[in-house]
From Swiss-Prot:
Keywords: Mitochondrion, Phosphoprotein, Stress response. Belongs to the ISF1/MBR1 family. One of its GO terms (biological process) is aerobic respiration. Induction: Expression is induced in the late growth phase and is negatively controlled by the cAMP-dependent protein kinase A (PKA). Pfam families: MBR1. Residues 99-115, 198-213 have a biased composition (Polar residues). The keyword Phosphoprotein applies. Its main location: mitochondrion. GO terms for cellular component: mitochondrion. This is Mitochondrial biogenesis regulation protein 1.
Length: 339
């Protein structure tokens, strides 16, 4: 009876086919079918049992009669009926002949193909392998377009620089100050370069100067301070001391040296020598400013006029910078001119 079967051994594929042919499977047979690998987990035959059965079925239908081809002996030696399916087809089967050809023809064809592809000494390829690196095209399709695109920004830069240089040369010839040159640039916001035809306004008010300073323009007061021609005065800051009042030091050097040695600021002798000592003493104690404090725009002819009374000169001199102390540069200049 079926109940007397032992469940220790797993059922083979043939037994399972017999069970299917007999009729419906009982519960115990179902358990035996699903518990085959559980009963003996260390057995490898459970995994390859079905594959071996299929291989035996194929080998039973295979024709083992000898063939006329010389490759048949090699194929029979390598074909093992007990080996697995993956090992049944060796690597040498790639050279198997076709139905209409022979092995020698196939070997000759493969050798010719290999010689044409892998022959490094062939003169056709110049002694180099047939593989070549693909040429990569640049971003620009033509060289002319690349050159034009690279030259256009250079031309723009050159035109801007040339415009600035021309404006700098034209302004250096004249006596205009830099604030006057920037008046056109402050009013015209869109254009960065002054054109040749544009002439800036001669009148430059303080309001426009403050407007330019608010737009982070550091503008000097005079042209001599920022120009490259007047380098000594720009470096040492002596342009405000270069005035017609320095001529008075050459007119009367002895009296000016005495006054500088006594540390008496705001006291410089007049350009004309006096006959009486009373007038010179009264002039020394006066509160009038020295001739060094005159602005740049004063008239220089008043120092070269003929002798006049001291009272007239004292009334004609304006009182500029009465409370300013003389600097070391003024004293050194006075001593250098006096010597």
């Amino acid at each position: 009876m079926r109940m007397e079967k032992t469940t220790d051994k797993p059922l083979s594929a043939g037994d399972m086919n017999d069970e299917y042919s007999r009729g419906p499977i009982d519960d115990i047979d179902c358990l035996n079918f699903f518990e085959r690998a559980v009963q003996d987990p260390c057995c490898e035959a459970c995994d390859t049992e079905d594959a071996d059965e299929e291989l035996r079925a194929k080998l039973s239908s295979f024709n083992f009669q000898p063939d006329s081809s010389p490759c048949n002996a090699k194929c029979q030696q390598t074909l093992n009926p007990l080996c697995k399916i993956d090992e049944a087809l060796p690597a040498e089967s790639e050279l198997a002949p076709s139905r209409n050809g022979s092995v020698s023809e196939a070997n000759s064809d493969t050798n010719s193909i290999a010689s044409t592809v892998h022959d490094p000494v062939d003169s056709k390829y110049g002694g180099m392998p047939s593989l070549r690196k693909a040429k990569t095209t640049s971003y620009f399709t033509s060289s002319s377009s690349n050159n034009t695109t690279m030259r256009n920004p250079l031309k723009k830069c050159n035109t801007n620089i040339n415009g600035l240089l021309v404006n700098g040369r034209s302004s250096s010839s004249s006596r205009q100050s830099i604030p006057e040159l920037f008046s056109g640039a402050c009013t015209k916001k869109k254009n960065n370069v002054l054109l040749k035809s544009e002439t800036p306004n001669s009148e430059f008010s303080s309001n426009s100067l403050q407007h330019c300073n608010s737009r982070s323009f550091s503008l000097p007061r005079s042209r001599s301070r920022s120009s490259a021609i007047a380098i000594p005065t720009h470096l040492y800051g002596l342009e405000k001391y270069v005035s017609p009042g320095l001529d008075t030091l050459t007119a009367d050097p002895e009296e000016s040296i005495e006054r500088f040695s006594n540390n008496r600021p705001r006291e410089i002798s007049s350009c004309c020598p006096n006959d009486t000592g009373d007038t010179s003493s009264s002039l020394s104690h006066s509160n009038t400013s020295s001739s060094l404090n005159f602005p740049l725009g004063t008239n220089t002819n008043q120092f070269h006029q003929p002798r006049q009374p001291v009272q007239q000169q004292q009334s004609s001199k304006p009182n500029f910078g009465a409370g300013r102390k003389k600097s070391f540069i003024e004293m050194s200049l006075a001593s250098s001119f006096a010597g």
